[in-house]
Each structure stands twice: as C-alpha cells, then as structure tokens.
Design a protein with these regions (language model features):
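N-terminal Rossmann-like NAD(P) cofactor-binding subdomain of oxidoreductases
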Residues: 1-54, 194-198, 202-216
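Predominant activation on well-ordered alpha-helical scaffold segments within soluble catalytic domains
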Residues: 21-28, 76-80, 120-123, 188-196
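C-terminal substrate-binding/catalytic lobe of Rossmann-fold NAD(P)-dependent oxidoreductases
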Residues: 35-185
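Short, cationic low-complexity segments
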Residues: 129-139, 201-207, 216-219
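Long, low-complexity C-terminal extensions of enzymes
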Residues: 175-207
Length: 219
C-alpha cells in the first residue's frame, strides 16, 4: 500500500501471486530497481484442492489456458498490477496447471536480469529476506508436514519456500528455480499487515513484527 493513500479498500492477491511477487522482488528488483528485471516467466503448478475439502479433486493433471494476451494466467497479471502501484512496468508472463495433489502449490520461475548475477548472489538475497524460507526438501508433502507440525496453527506464514538445490544461474543473467507456495499463510500475513496499516498507518510495520518469530529461515 502507498503511504498517504486514501484507499478504503485493498485487494489481497492470491497465494501464488504472493510467491511470484516475492521471488521477483527479492532476486531481481530489490536494491537494483525495476529496470533490472528484463523478463519474468512463471509456471504455477497448483494443488487440486485443500485437505479440508471433500470436493473438486481431480484424477489427473489438468492444464490451464492463457486468458490474458499479455500476461497468460491471472497470476502474472495480478503481480504486474501489484508492482504497478509502485510505478513499475514489468515484463511478466505466467502459465498455470493443476495436479492431483492436496499438499502445496509449486512455482517454477525464470528471471532474466540486466545486471550479472551468480548463484551465491541469489542465495544471499534469499537468505537476507526474513519472509523467504529455504529448504533442501524437494517434495511438497515433507514441507507441508513441517508446516503442520511446526507452523502457526499448522500454517507457514513465509511468502515462499525456495528449494535451494533447484536454483540455477545461466549466462550470468538467467535465474531458474522451484519454490513452494505456503497457501493461505502468506496471504493471511498480508491481510494482517493491511489491517494494521488502516489502524496504525504510521507504526504498522513495527506492530506486525510481533509475528516475526513465526517466520522460518529454513524448513
């Protein structure tokens, strides 16, 4: 949200859009500015439904369509709109599909940067963001189980969980990787922050720090 904004309503974007936005900002934009992102490409591999739901499960993977001519699925469009509130005009495109799982969404990402970057640079940027968790686990079931056992009411509040060994840098400018989406958890944190912003516009950032102990560095 912009400072000194007169907005009475806000949109809290989806959990996958949170993930896309966090990864893009952390790796490509923060400390460099929006011009550092040449392009961002994303594949949202979505779970079929939540473990609490008895309906809408699918028997096999199902691919989505590209509804938007410029952005593909709504995820990149929503992330673009989010960054546009800061005056950024980003080159983003996403695709989406569902798989027959109830655990977690998976995000594949490709970020091309203007400035050269190394794998160690990427890791340092991810580790410097308190809202990013990293993991050596490569299955959604084991990360989901960790959240169930150790998360706040079973939820992971981090914006994303990056699989470290999946990260790859090509030609000094192209970053590839996979990360898991803490569905509900990351958008819940944004909802709390937005509410605090309305109530305490000048001190909301300090007030939400009471939740910082609920963020994981490593899963």
């Amino acid at each position: 949200m912009k400072e000194n904004s007169d907005n009475q309503f806000i949109q809290v974007v989806s959990c996958n859009t949170h993930n896309i936005s966090c990864i893009t900002n952390t790796i490509a934009i923060k400390d460099f500015g929006p011009d550092n992102l040449k392009e961002g490409r994303f594949m949202c591999i979505r779970r079929a439904n939540d473990t609490s739901q008895s309906g809408n499960f699918i028997a096999a993977p199902s691919v989505g369509v590209h509804d938007d001519e410029n952005f593909g699925s709504h995820h990149a469009k929503d992330s673009y709109d989010l960054f546009s509130t800061l005056g950024y005009d980003l080159n983003m495109f996403s695709s989406a599909m569902k798989v027959n799982s109830q655990y977690m969404h998976v995000l594949w990402f490709y970020l091309k940067t203007k400035e050269a970057v190394t794998l160690n640079d990427v890791l340092d940027r991810l580790h410097a963001n308190d809202l990013v968790a990293t993991t050596s686990k490569n299955m959604t079931s084991t990360v989901f189980s960790f959240g169930r056992d150790h998360g706040h009411f079973g939820r992971i509040l981090n914006q994303t969980v990056v699989v470290e060994q999946s990260l790859h840098v090509k030609n000094d400018h192209e970053v590839y990787g996979y990360c898991f989406t803490p569905q509900d958890g990351n958008s819940i944190l944004s909802s709390i922050s937005a509410t605090e912003h309305f109530l305490y516009p000048h001190s909301f950032e300090d007030k939400v720090q009471c939740l910082s102990e609920l963020f994981f560095e490593e899963i």
